[in-house]
Structures are given as structure tokens and as C-alpha cells.
């Protein structure tokens, strides 16, 4: 009897094993979100738990004669514990089902297919069936806990479950695995090979080249007159091309044991050897050898269907359970050849391995894969230092005469071998068929006996009926003289003792009633005894079936046309525009055609230009000139003078809009600074504000790094700096303060604009904000203001607009914003109180005074517009001189701007409402300020992450993007900014490269796109139309989507419709798709985006169908495929789909 320490060590070892297996299962559950029933971790876990439960089990509890001790134990526990009783009943039913199916399969019964679906269990799973089922039924922890509580009844004193500590620990360890959900779904291998979109496309590209279906008259794949016989391989791989390609990849169901490329096979005698990929795969049930030509693996087959089909004919799939012999021929100058011989005597084409020991490596992998149930006979030898080597055996002829070979030859000498695949645990005797009508028994001789060349001995199971006509074409019937002598050690064995893998399936009768009433031993009669059905009845049945199919096809077509008329007629223009009339539109709109049109607008009609764009796109060099026409900024037929007038109006409108939101933004920034200052003031307890500010000045605060504002007049400079000092500069670093002092000294040398230049100057100079009236005087006297943000850029981090300075004698915008005077010595407390009083006073100004201000400003606008336009046109020539400011911007961009603040519009809702006042005297309601603040933060966040990897979006151009977006949102504040709007603006800005022009075109574009955002209702309409299109044009795909859930919501299309496919394509493709969409409105369909979306789905429809994708899978697939689509192919297919719908409507 083992000592106590040894028993304790055994218990700890068993417990550690269970802990390790539990940890692996729980990690798998967390990592993969599920645990599959066939997971190897479950097998290991069941084995570990079973070892613990059986440790120290009493013989009486296990049963004296029972081989399955776990079953005996659980059945005894079931007498007193209901969960164990239920488990016993379920497992016994399952065992009975498995045993019954196994017996019927061994008996070769025809009605085996009528059995209930047998669970696909591996031998190890069957071995641990009781523990495994208890785990899946979530009662294992309860049963073990019961055993722990009643351990004295079932276990010896040294047992693990008898231990007062280890026993409860084991029971508690099982609670976690029993709480998990286990699945049988196909997603079992997603952890192994959850294929990416790349791999799915590649697999589809390989097997999609197989387009021709098998036909009865096609040439056999290997040019061997091979007939269907028991145990033989099909003429072609039984799997479809897709399944064949899928099986080449590693997954949890099939393990790749061996793979080698450039293995030569000669499919036909009249052709050269073809290189291909040889792979050995093992599943729980079968081992398979596959060979695929390199042309299919590389996707390099020709475009001809015949060529594609021929290569698929060459591909081979061989089940090794059908192979008996492996003939290995070694050549000194090559790597060796393997010839496989199957049970029915058919010799497979030789596999020629390249040099380098690949033949031996293949045999080694094959032998390892056969274990533990099978092996090679003779086995490979293991040699120290070399690993597996060929065996050194004396070969004999079939008659037993020894050949002149010795076992001590040099290892490098080329030697031929014949290996047999055997299963040691089973008797492998066969019965030879009697070709002349008599039955003789024969056993297979020694494995290393050579079979004479040109002859294969056929061994089959007794009890099977063979069709003589088939054998006549396969093997010549030997005469009695030619028959090989039978070995003496004949044995007559029962067919039930044969290995199940080698038992041939009997020939099936063509009569269903005969096949159902087949004999129990699998034999059947040579023909059908029933009377033949009259030929007329057969013809009548065929006629009725043809008529029925034609009628239901016609009925389905009528229903489809009804759906087309109801749902799809409004999606397309009914007039079909040809791509070839009056000329081929494949080249699109070229620069030559466009120049001719601009010179003479009557040379081309608008519809003809749109037709060219729809079928061929726009030449990239002229997109900047053509896009404003497509988007409605210009009208086709406008003269150059008319276009200039439109540009001037747009520039003036854009400048005025910018001035409005810049004034509002100034107040927003000021409010934020004041709120920060107020929060800091509350933090000071007992100390004076001065001392507190003094301390804060020396902190490198990151709360805000906004610059203070200044005004052009001397007094406003003083007041503004005082305000800024009391509210903003407490957040600035010491370096910034020093910079402010230096810039203030520089500004003292600059000319100041007197207060007398104010236009109808009723604005309080003490408001603490710059006045737009000062801007007006500056623009009148100095005619070089620039609207280009190349000069001063609004950035998302520094958002304080400042006063525009005259160009001649002006200072840097940072200097103007930070300017101060040395006479600013007023105490900050007094200034803060005074500003508060002035703000209250200004808030109560009457509406009449406000209207008088804006009325005067409107009168001055025409004078300013000329100046504004001159400054805008000069911005392009000035931008090259701003290199220094752009460099500074890239490091720490400022938020000040040199845009002219023109007259602002009245935006307040009530004269008596307390509202902040801008520098121009315009009042803003608190609701408006809050709304703009929210949108401003959203815009800044999106602008900073808009296509950062695209070359165009430098910090300066991002500022242009921000300016345009803020201007648009200011005009549509009731809608506000929604994520994605920047994506729609970005391509316009890239092409047009002009703020005002891009602003106008974006406004036109948003008239259509606004409805796709949440505040519109177009998205649901798109989904419904998409559903109708797929239902009509691709019923198979529609059925899949109907099967996989809520098919009425095509959410995977949401981003496509929201952004016009902007995130699905690269920029060059976005340009092409967008201009096609805009032209399609007038040529084919105002809903062309639907057909592009359908085309995208159709391009990958086979992949979607093959992988049975649900909406989550489709979204994931298209996200991974973003910016990698063949856009020209998609657009061509979209045009074809439009034409198809137009034709359906036309023929209704």
C-alpha cells in the first residue's frame, strides 16, 4: 500500500490537472465567446475529472464486472440522486443509439440512412461520454458535490473525494465549466480560421474559376477507365469546388498534416507532368490526400471556361481509407515517386516529389497520422541522429522467392518499397471475387511482397455482389491458367470482422422499392423484378412536370413584374440612354470636349455632357471646372461673366457668414474663459485675487491656451487686455506671458486706427470684444485684406477670433491678439466689476438701436464687397509667402483669424432678453450660444481626424475645412452638425481648393444628402428600396437575408448611403463615383446610389452565399474590404442593373 505522502502527492497532482483544464476552458470561453462541444480542451477536462472521480473508488461501487466504472458509479448514485438518474437515462439512450448504428453499419444494411441523426463523436468523446454529457447538461458539479458529501459510501479512505479539503475544492472547480454554454455551431473553427475578407476573396477567386458543371459525357479526370465500385473514389472530387478549396485550409475539423508544393503529377499519358500542391488532411473520421494544380492555387488559369474546367478535372481527392498499398520508388537523381493502389485495384497517378527528402517526410507524416489505430507495414525505422528512415528489409516476390537485395546496403542507395496500410486492432483478411463463378478465399500476403508489374491483385469482402460488366472494362478477366496461385494460409472469416473502413458498399438497385427491401446481408438481386412502367405513363409524367415548371415560372415572373411596377418604377428614368449613341461614351468627358463647350455652349447639349460623364466619368484635369456645374453652383449655358457674378455673390455671402459665426465664437470663447476664471476664483480662500493670479501665472496650465483679444483702437486695446488678463491669461504658461509682453512692445510701434472711423459708431468700446465697425474702416482705407486661411488659420485648439488689421503696416495675428499697452495698470478687481456693469447695460439696449446699427451696416456692404473680393482673389498669390506662419501653425496653430468681420445679422429673439453682445453690437440669445457651442466642439473633433493620411489635409487645409463647416452649420443651426458631414465636404475641398466655392457646392450637395442623416427620413426609404431590388434581381441572395433575420433593414448599407460610399473607396474612386451619381440623376436614375450598393453586394454575392453570412458578417466583411474594391467593375455592374430594371419596366 502506498505511503501517506505518496497518496497526498497523487491527490495534488490530480487536482492540479483539473485546475489547469478548468483554466483552459474558461480562457477559451472568454477569448472565443463560446466553447465548442468538440474542443480538445473538453476532452482533456473530462479525462482529468474522470481520473479524480475514479481515484480510490471502491470495487463494490464500481461494479465487479463493469468495464465502464464511471457508468456504474453514476447509475448507483442515480438511485438516490435525481440529477444523476436523469443523466443515466440520457446517456444510456445515446449509447444505445450509437451501438445500434454501429451494428447496422457493420451489417451493411441499406436502410442505414433511416436512422436518427448520429452525433458526430470521436472515439475519445465516446470514451468519456458520461462525464461529457454531465458537463453539457450542467449537472457534473452537482453529482461530484453529492459524491463528496457521501464519499464514505463510495470511496476508500485515501481517495481524493474523501479528503476534507481536496474533495470540496474539486466540486467547486466544476461550477465554472458547468455554467458555460457549449455549442455545435459551425463557428467552432472561427478561432482557428475566422477568415478575413482577403482570404475569403482569395478562396473564392481560386474555386470560382470552376464554372463548368460535371456532365455524364465528360472525360474522366485521370484518364483511367474507372467505374463506380465499392470503396472507390468518385470520378471527380465529391466536394464542390468551393468545399475543395475550403478543405485545403487549416481549421478545427481538419488538421493539415503535410503540405508540399511543386509535386508533379502526370494526369494523362499524352501530356507533361503538371506541378501542384500536395496536402494531407486528417479529420476525426478520415484522412484525405489532395493534389491541386498550381494554376488553380495561384489563380492563373486562362479566361476560357474549357481551360478552367480541365484544371479542375486534374485536381484529386483521395481517401486513404480506400488505399491499401503505397509503392515508393526512389531515384538517385530525383526525390522519389509514390504510387497509391486502392482496394479495388486501381492505381493512382504517380506523385513525383522534388529532391530533398520530401518522400520520406511525407511517409513519416502519413504514419503519424495513422496512429493510434493504423500504421504502415513495414513501419519506418527510427535512427538516432536522423529520425525516421526507410526500413531495411528483404523484399520478396509474390511467389516467395527472395530477391538479390541485402539489408546492409548503403543508406543512400535508391531502393523501392511497398508499404501496406493496416489496422493492427482489426483482422484484415479479404475474400477474392470469383471471376469464373467460383468463390475462393485469399488472405493478403506479407506487406513487403512485391506485386508483379502490370498486375494488381484485387481483394474484396465476401458477401458483396459485383457487377460483371463493370469489371470487364476495368480489369481483364483472368483465365484459370493466368490466375495467381493462392497462398496456403487461407482463412474464412466473417464479414463483420472486417475493418469498417475497408468494407465495400454493395451496388444499389435503381428501384426504390427493391433498395428498401434489400436483404439483411447487403446482397441484392441482379435486377428489378417489378414490371417496367409503361413508357407512355413515363412520358406523360415528364410532360406534366415540364408544363408545371413552365407555368410556375411564368407565374413567378408575373409576380416579379407586379413588384417592379409597384416598387421599382420610380427608381429609374423610363427613357433608356444608350452608351453608344450618338458616339461612344466610354472615354467620358475629356478636356477637349469641355474646352469646346466653354468656347461655344451650343456645340454640346447638357444631356450629352451628362451622358458622357455617366458612362465614362470626367478627366481629372477638368474636374475643378466641371463639378460646380454638376452640383448646381453654375447652370449649364452660363457665360463667363455670369459665372463671375455668381462667384462674387458667393464670396460676399461666405465672408458675411464667417463674420457672423466668428462674432458668436468670440463670445463663446470669452464665456469659457470667464467660467474658468470664476472656477479658479472660488478656489482661492483667504488670499487676494492678485496673489492667486500671480501664482497661477507661474503654472503651466493646460486647461486653456487661448489668446486674449485686442481691438484696433487704443482704448479698446487697453480694455480688452484688461479683460483678457482677468479671465484668460491665468491659464497661460510663463513662456506665453513673456511672449505677450514682447509682442506688446512691438505693437506700440504699429499705426492705430482712430475711433472716429467707426461706421455709425454706437457700439460700446468697453464691451471687451472687437468691433466689426472698426473692420469696416480698415477695409475702406486699406484695400488688401485676405480671406485665405493660409494667412491666419482657425484651429480646433485656439478658437478666439480677433480683429482684422490692415495689410500695410499690420502685425502678425498673434501680435495683434496679444497686444497690450504699458499703461494698463488698473487693478483687475475694478476692471472685472466695471465689465460686468457694462455688460448688463448693453444687454438692455433697445431693439431699435440694434436695428439702426445693422441698417447702417447693410448700407455699407456694397462698398466692402469690392474690397472683400479683391482680397479673396489675391489670396492664392499670397499663400506662397506664408511659409513661416504655416510652419508655426503645424507646431502650435493659433485660433485667431484675419477674416473681415462684416455686418452681423440680428439673431436675438427678444429685445428684453438678457443676451451677450458681440463686438459689432449683435446680441445672441443664450440658447443660440449654447447650440453653437455644442456644434463647434463636434466640428473641431471631426475636422482633426478627417482623412489625416491623405496628402491634401495639412493643418492649413484642415482650417479651410473647419471654416466651411462652421459657416454651413451657422446657416443651418437648427439642424446642427452630424458626424459624417466632414466626410462629404472633404472631397469637394480637395477638388475645388477654394473655400467659398466649396462652401457653395457643399450647400448644394447637402440638399440631397441631408435627408440621409438622422433628422431626415430617407434612410428607411433606401433600405426598403434595396430590399425590393434584391428581391427582384437576386432572389437567392434575398432568401439568405430573409433566413438570417430582419431582412427589411439593410444596416450594412447605412454608411454607404450616408456618405455616398466615401469611406468605401479611395479618393480617386470617390471622385469617379460621385460625378457618376450626379450625372445619373439626369441620365438613368435619381436613386443611382441604390444600384451602386446593389452592385457592391452582387460583386461579392457568391462569397456571402457560400459563407452563409448574416448582417454582422456582411458588415465585418465590407469594413475589411473598404478602399479595395474594383470601382470600375462596380460602376459597370450598377449601370447594367439600372438597364435591367428599365428593361423590365419597358417590357411589362
UniProtKB/Swiss-Prot annotation:
Domain RUN: residue ranges: 36-190
Rab-GAP TBC domain span: 617-1081
Main localization (coarse): Golgi
GO molecular function, one term: GTPase activator activity
Keyword Membrane: yes
Compositional bias annotation for Basic and acidic residues: 742-751, 805-816, 871-883
Keyword Ligase tagged: no
The protein, known as: Small G protein signaling modulator 1
Taxonomic source organism: Homo sapiens (Human)
Amino acid at each position: 500500500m502506498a505511503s501517506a505522502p505518496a497518496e497526498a502527492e497523487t491527490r495534488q497532482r490530480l487536482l492540479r490537472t483539473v485546475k489547469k483544464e478548468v483554466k483552459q476552458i474558461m480562457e477559451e470561453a472568454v477569448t472565443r465567446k463560446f466553447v465548442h462541444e468538440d474542443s480538445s480542451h473538453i476532452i482533456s477536462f473530462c479525462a482529468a475529472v474522470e481520473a479524480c472521480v475514479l481515484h480510490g473508488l471502491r470495487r463494490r461501487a464500481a461494479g465487479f464486472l463493469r468495464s465502464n466504472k464511471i457508468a456504474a458509479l453514476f447509475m448507483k448514485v442515480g438511485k438516490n440522486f435525481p440529477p444523476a438518474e436523469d443523466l443515466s437515462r440520457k446517456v444510456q439512450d445515446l449509447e444505445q443509439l450509437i451501438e445500434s448504428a454501429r451494428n447496422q453499419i457493420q451489417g451493411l444494411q441499406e436502410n442505414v440512412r433511416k436512422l436518427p441523426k448520429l452525433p458526430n463523436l470521436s472515439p475519445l468523446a465516446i470514451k468519456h461520454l458520461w462525464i461529457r454529457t454531465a458537463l453539457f447538461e450542467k449537472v457534473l458539479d452537482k453529482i461530484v458535490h453529492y459524491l463528496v458529501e457521501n464519499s464514505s459510501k463510495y470511496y476508500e479512505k485515501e481517495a481524493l473525494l474523501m479528503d476534507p479539503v481536496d474533495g470540496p475544492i474539486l466540486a467547486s472547480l466544476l461550477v465554472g465549466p458547468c455554467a458555460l454554454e457549449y455549442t455545435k455551431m459551425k463557428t467552432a473553427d472561427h478561432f482557428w480560421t475566422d477568415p478575413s475578407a482577403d482570404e475569403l476573396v482569395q478562396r473564392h477567386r481560386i474555386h470560382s474559376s470552376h464554372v463548368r458543371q460535371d456532365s455524364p459525357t465528360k472525360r474522366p479526370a485521370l484518364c483511367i477507365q474507372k467505374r463506380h465500385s465499392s470503396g472507390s473514389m468518385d470520378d471527380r472530387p465529391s466536394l464542390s469546388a468551393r468545399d475543395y478549396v475550403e478543405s485545403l485550409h487549416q481549421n478545427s475539423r481538419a488538421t493539415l498534416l503535410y503540405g508540399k508544393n511543386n509535386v508533379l503529377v502526370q494526369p494523362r499519358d499524352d501530356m507533361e507532368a503538371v506541378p501542384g500542391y500536395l496536402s494531407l488532411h486528417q479529420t476525426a473520421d478520415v484522412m484525405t490526400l489532395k493534389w491541386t494544380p498550381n494554376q488553380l492555387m495561384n489563380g492563373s488559369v486562362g479566361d476560357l471556361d474549357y481551360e478552367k474546367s480541365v484544371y479542375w478535372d486534374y485536381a484529386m481527392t483521395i481517401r486513404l481509407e480506400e488505399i491499401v498499398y503505397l509503392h515508393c520508388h526512389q531515384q538517385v537523381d530525383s526525390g522519389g515517386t509514390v504510387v497509391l493502389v486502392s482496394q479495388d485495384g486501381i492505381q493512382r497517378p504517380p506523385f513525383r516529389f522534388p529532391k530533398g527528402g520530401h518522400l520520406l517526410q511525407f511517409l513519416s507524416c502519413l504514419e503519424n497520422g495513422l496512429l493510434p489505430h493504423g500504421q504502415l507495414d513495414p513501419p519506418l525505422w527510427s535512427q538516432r541522429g536522423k529520425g525516421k528512415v526507410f526500413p531495411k528489409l528483404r523484399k520478396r516476390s509474390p511467389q516467395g522467392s527472395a530477391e538479390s537485395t541485402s539489408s546492409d546496403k548503403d543508406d543512400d542507395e535508391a531502393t523501392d518499397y511497398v508499404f501496406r496500410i493496416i489496422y493492427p486492432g482489426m483482422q484484415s483478411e479479404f475474400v477474392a471475387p470469383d471471376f469464373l463463378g467460383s468463390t475462393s478465399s485469399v488472405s493478403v500476403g506479407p506487406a513487403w511482397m512485391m506485386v508483379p508489374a502490370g498486375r494488381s491483385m484485387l481483394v474484396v469482402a465476401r458477401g458483396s455482389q459485383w457487377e460483371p460488366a463493370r469489371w470487364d472494362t476495368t480489369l481483364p478477366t483472368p483465365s484459370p491458367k493466368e490466375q495467381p496461385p493462392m497462398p496456403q494460409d487461407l482463412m474464412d472469416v466473417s464479414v463483420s470482422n472486417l475493418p469498417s473502413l475497408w468494407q465495400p458498399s454493395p451496388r444499389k438497385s435503381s428501384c426504390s422499392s427493391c433498395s428498401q427491401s434489400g436483404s439483411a446481408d447487403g446482397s441484392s438481386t441482379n435486377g428489378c423484378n417489378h414490371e417496367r412502367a409503361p413508357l407512355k405513363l413515363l412520358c406523360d409524367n415528364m410532360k406534366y412536370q415540364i408544363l408545371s415548371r413552365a407555368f410556375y415560372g411564368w407565374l413567378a415572373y408575373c409576380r416579379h413584374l407586379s413588384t417592379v411596377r409597384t416598387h421599382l418604377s420610380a427608381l429609374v428614368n423610363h427613357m433608356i440612354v444608350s452608351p453608344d449613341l450618338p458616339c461612344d461614351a466610354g472615354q467620358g468627358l475629356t478636356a477637349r470636349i469641355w474646352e469646346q463647350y466653354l468656347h461655344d455652349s451650343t456645340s454640346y447639349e447638357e444631356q450629352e455632357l451628362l451622358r458622357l460623364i455617366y458612362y465614362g466619368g470626367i478627366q481629372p484635369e477638368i474636374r475643378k471646372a466641371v463639378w460646380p456645374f454638376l452640383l448646381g453652383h453654375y447652370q449649364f449655358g452660363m457665360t463667363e461673366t455670369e459665372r463671375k457674378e455668381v462667384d462674387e455673390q458667393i464670396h460676399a455671402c461666405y465672408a458675411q457668414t464667417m463674420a457672423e459665426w466668428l462674432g458668436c465664437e468670440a463670445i463663446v470663447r470669452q464665456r469659457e474663459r470667464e467660467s474658468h476664471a470664476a472656477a479658479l476664483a472660488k478656489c482661492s480662500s483667504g488670499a487676494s485675487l492678485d496673489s492667486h493670479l500671480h501664482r497661477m501665472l507661474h503654472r503651466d496650465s493646460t486647461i486653456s491656451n487661448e489668446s486674449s483679444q485686442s481691438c484696433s483702437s487704443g482704448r479698446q486695446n487697453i480694455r480688452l487686455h484688461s479683460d483678457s488678463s482677468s479671465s484668460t491669461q491665468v491659464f497661460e504658461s510663463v513662456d506665453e506671458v513673456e511672449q505677450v509682453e514682447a509682442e506688446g512692445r512691438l505693437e506700440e510701434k504699429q499705426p492705430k486706427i482712430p475711433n472716429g472711423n467707426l461706421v455709425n459708431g454706437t457700439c460700446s468700446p468697453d464691451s471687451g470684444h472687437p468691433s466689426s465697425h472698426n473692420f469696416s474702416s480698415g477695409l475702406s482705407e486699406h484695400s488688401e485684406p485676405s480671406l485665405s486661411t493660409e494667412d491666419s488659420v482657425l484651429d480646433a485648439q485656439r478658437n478666439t477670433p480677433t480683429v482684422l488689421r490692415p495689410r500695410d503696416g499690420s502685425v502678425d495675428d498673434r501680435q495683434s491678439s496679444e497686444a497690450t499697452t504699458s499703461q494698463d495698470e488698473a487693478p483687475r478687481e475694478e476692471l472685472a466689476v466695471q465689465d460686468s456693469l457694462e455688460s448688463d447695460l448693453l444687454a438692455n439696449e433697445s431693439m431699435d438701436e440694434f436695428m439702426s446699427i445693422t441698417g447702417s451696416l447693410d448700407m455699407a456692404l456694397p462698398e466692402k464687397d469690392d474690397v472683400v473680393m479683391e482680397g479673396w482673389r489675391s489670396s492664392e498669390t499670397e499663400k506662397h509667402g506664408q511659409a513661416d506662419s504655416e510652419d508655426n501653425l503645424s507646431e502650435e496653430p493659433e485660433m485667431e483669424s484675419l477674416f473681415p468681420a462684416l455686418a452681423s445679422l440680428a439673431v436675438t429673439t427678444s429685445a428684453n432678453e438678457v443676451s451677450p453682445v458681440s463686438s459689432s453690437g449683435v446680441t445672441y440669445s443664450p440658447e443660440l450660444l449654447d447650440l453653437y457651442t455644442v456644434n463647434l466642439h463636434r466640428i473641431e473633433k471631426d475636422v482633426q481626424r478627417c482623412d489625416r493620411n491623405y496628402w491634401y489635409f495639412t493643418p492649413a487645409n484642415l482650417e479651410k475645412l473647419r471654416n466651411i463647416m462652421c459657416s454651413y452649420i451657422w446657416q443651418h443651426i437648427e439642424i446642427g452638425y452630424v458626424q459624417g458631414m466632414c466626410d462629404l465636404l472633404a472631397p469637394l475641398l480637395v477638388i475645388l481648393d477654394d473655400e467659398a466655392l466649396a462652401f457653395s457646392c457643399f450647400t448644394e450637395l447637402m440638399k440631397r444628402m441631408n435627408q440621409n442623416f438622422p433628422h431626415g427620413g430617407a434612410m428607411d426609404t433606401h433600405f426598403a428600396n434595396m430590399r425590393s431590388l434584391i428581391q427582384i434581381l437576386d432572389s437567392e441572395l434575398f432568401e439568405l437575408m430573409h433566413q438570417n433575420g430582419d431582412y427589411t433593414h439593410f444596416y450594412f448599407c447605412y454608411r454607404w448611403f450616408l456618405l455616398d460610399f466615401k469611406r468605401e473607396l479611395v479618393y480617386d474612386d470617390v471622385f469617379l463615383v460621385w460625378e457618376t451619381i450626379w450625372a445619373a440623376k439626369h441620365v438613368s436614375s435619381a436613386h443611382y446610389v441604390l444600384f451602386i450598393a446593389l452592385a457592391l453586394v452582387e460583386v461579392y454575392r457568391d462569397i456571402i452565399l457560400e459563407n452563409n453570412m448574416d448582417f454582422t458578417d456582411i458588415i465585418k466583411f465590407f469594413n475589411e474590404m473598404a478602399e479595395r474594391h474594383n470601382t470600375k467593375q462596380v460602376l459597370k455592374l450598377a449601370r447594367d442593373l439600372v438597364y435591367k430594371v428599365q428593361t423590365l419596366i419597358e417590357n411589362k
